[in-house]
Amino acid sequence: MVPVAYYLVLSAILFSIGVGAFLIKRNIITIFMSIELMLNAVNLSFVAFANYWRQINHQFSGQIFVFFVMVVAAAEAAVGLAIIIALFRSRSTLNVDQVDLMKL
């Protein structure tokens, strides 16, 4: 059985990659994907903790919480992609520096 610490280290690495890409990249799609990577890193840590606590308490609350986070992430992805498509149609670019103003 793989120790929980390995999953937490992997989750921290994925979250760090997501934060780094969020801070460095200027493309809206890349920023959006880095936010999704951070959400999935948090989901991985929730599942790891749920598996660890399931061995002790025999409860599945962590997996249920991950399911709700995935539902919210799917809704966020749909709304985010719709906003990105609308920005691309109006500005013809996906560069954050060029679409930072909320005007036509």
Curated annotation (Swiss-Prot):
Its EC number is 7.1.1.-. It is an enzyme of class 7 (translocase). InterPro entries: NADH_UbQ_OxRdtase_chain4L/K (IPR001133), NUOK/Mnh_C1-like (IPR039428). It is a multi-pass membrane protein. It holds the Pfam family Oxidored_q2. One of its GO terms (cellular component) is NADH dehydrogenase complex. The keyword NAD applies. Gene3D superfamilies: 1.10.287.3510. One of its GO terms (biological process) is ATP synthesis coupled electron transport. Keywords: Cell inner membrane, Cell membrane, Membrane, NAD, Quinone, Translocase, Transmembrane, Transmembrane helix, Transport, Ubiquinone. The keyword Cell inner membrane applies. Belongs to the complex I subunit 4L family. NDH-1 shuttles electrons from NADH, via FMN and iron-sulfur (Fe-S) centers, to quinones in the respiratory chain. The immediate electron acceptor for the enzyme in this species is believed to be ubiquinone. Couples the redox reaction to proton translocation (for every two electrons transferred, four hydrogen ions are translocated across the cytoplasmic membrane), and thus conserves the redox energy in a proton gradient. This is NADH-quinone oxidoreductase subunit K.
